Curated annotation (Swiss-Prot):
An example Gene Ontology biological process: innate immune response
Name listed for the protein in its UniProt record: Immunity-related GTPase family M protein 3
Keyword Endoplasmic reticulum among UniProt keywords: yes
Organism (species): Mus musculus
Residues reported to bind GTP: 92-99, 117-121, 200-202
Ranges of residues in domain IRG-type G: 83-260
Up-regulation conditions: Expression is induced in response to IFNG/IFN-gamma. Expressed in response to Toxoplasma gondii infection.
Reactions mediated catalytically: GTP + H2O = GDP + phosphate + H(+)
Family statement: Belongs to the TRAFAC class dynamin-like GTPase superfamily. IRG family.
Entry's localization field: Endoplasmic reticulum; Cytoplasmic vesicle membrane; Lipid droplet
Length: 423
């Protein structure tokens, strides 16, 4: 302690500044590694990959073999092309669910394969319909309506096995009842995709004294206010007439449905896989930061090269370990046939510019001070300080490379794996 107190005043101030800077950077680095999950709001889905496929993907990511990852995922996503998407149509009895299914399929109620319709309750048990010409590999399930019995919404949904469906369409007409609100609350809690469809708009227009725009606005406002009061986020809302399947919101409904079917079949499974990849990359980054042998090998080179060269060599090492070096990226680009994806690894000069923390840690003043501490007069006393600071820089580079790997892999998977979306 006597030695420290006898330090020249300007050196002591520099040392104090250095310690404060180290503590500040440590606070900055720590929360950065706690990345936000990309799919926190992902819808629940029955269309998931097998544990064996997930294990193979995770192993390839850990090995840094992104080309192998893309190959496995591509085969997996292609196998989803014939996944049968299950859509449930539900609501209060008498809301016109069966008529809606017929209109969605562009068939009349008099046709042989149509869902039975009528004034009295016609659907007493779940019935499955399809429309291969408009919605291939999609099951449209006409569920018995709520409200005919004293059955609670919870027991009704359990009986209908609602958790097995990929998308739920809540049909309403005349009034948006408490049952509709309860259905919406439950769908949100279960993280299910769902729509609200207001049918029989033709009847509303024929009996209302309000102009059409005002009536439509009033219906929409009433539904949204009821949902907001129940703290339900705004779902897609469509106002339609089953007798006019080409007018009002019906075309928009079909377009939205086609896109969501595509998402259920392809995008949702890919997002789940991407989250697995992200987690494996994060785990690998954590292991590398704790790898003492790797740090010692890199540290051994400090005496023969300056800090910048040492950190640049570290960047190249980490990129090879994660599979995002120039050679690996070029292989990925060639194998996917998408050279425009980019086959250039992150460069050191770009690395410094893209992260303010690393730029601060590599500034002239810090490097000069580290060199001062390495002199023969200081080495024995302050070696632990310089080693700690260098380790923090390497750990930060590992985190940056890991995040860059996540971004690059997600883009490569999206560009090379997803089939063209139906518009």
């Amino acid at each position: 302690m006597d030695l420290v107190t006898k330090l020249p005043q300007n050196i002591w101030k520099t040392f104090t500044l250095f310690i404060n800077m180290a503590n500040y950077l440590k606070r900055l680095i720590s929360p950065w590694s706690k990345s936000m999950t990309a799919g926190e709001s992902l819808y629940s889905s029955q269309n998931s990959s097998s544990p064996e496929v997930i294990e193979d993907i995770g192993k390839a990511v850990t090995e840094g073999n992104l080309q192998k990852v893309i190959g496995i995922v591509k085969d997996e996503i292609q196998s989803k092309s014939r996944y049968r998407v299950k859509i449930a149509v539900t609501g209060d009895s008498g809301n016109g669910m069966s008529s809606f299914i017929n209109a969605l399929r562009f068939i009349g109620h008099e046709e042989e394969d149509s869902a039975p319709t009528g004034v009295v309750r016609t659907t007493k048990k779940p019935a499955c319909y399809s429309s291969d010409s408009h919605f291939p590999y999609v099951e449209l399930w006409d569920l018995p309506g709520l409200g005919a019995t004293a059955q609670s919404v919870e027991s009704y949904l359990e009986e209908m096995q609602i958790s097995t469906f990929d998308l739920i369409i809540i049909v309403a007409s005349e009034q948006f009842s408490s049952n509709h609100v309860k259905l919406a609350i439950t769908m949100q809690r279960m993280r299910k995709r769902f729509y609200v469809v207001w049918t029989k708009l033709d009847r509303d227009l024929s009996t209302s004294t309000f102009p059409e725009p005002q009536l439509l606005q009033s219906i929409q406002r009433n539904i949204r206010e009821n949902l907001q009061q129940a703290q339900v986020r705004d779902p897609p809302l469509f106002l339609i007439s089953c007798f006019s399947p080409s007018f009002h919101d019906f075309p928009e409904l079909r377009n939205t449905l086609q896109k969501d079917i595509f998402s259920i079949r392809y995008r949702d499974p890919l997002e789940i896989i991407s989250q697995v990849c992200d987690k494996c990359i994060s785990n690998k980054a954590f292991s590398l930061k704790e790898d003492q042998m790797l740090m010692k090998d890199l540290e051994a080179a400090v005496s023969s090269e300056d800090d910048t060269a040492n950190l640049e060599r570290g960047l190249q090492t980490y990129q090879k370990l994660f599979g995002v070096d120039d050679g690996s990226l070029q292989q990925v680009a060639r194998s996917t046939g998408r050279l425009e994806m980019g086959s250039r690894a992150l460069q050191f000069q770009d690395l410094i510019k893209m992260d303010r923390r690393l730029e601060l840690m590599m500034c002239f003043a810090v490097n000069k001070f580290l060199r001062l501490l390495e002199s023969s007069w200081w080495y024995g006393l302050w070696n632990v300080v310089t080693r700690y600071f260098r380790h923090q820089r390497h750990k930060l580079v590992i985190e940056i490379v890991a995040e860059n790997t996540k971004t690059s892999l997600r883009k490569a998977l999206k560009d090379s794996v997803l089939p063209p979306e139906i518009h």
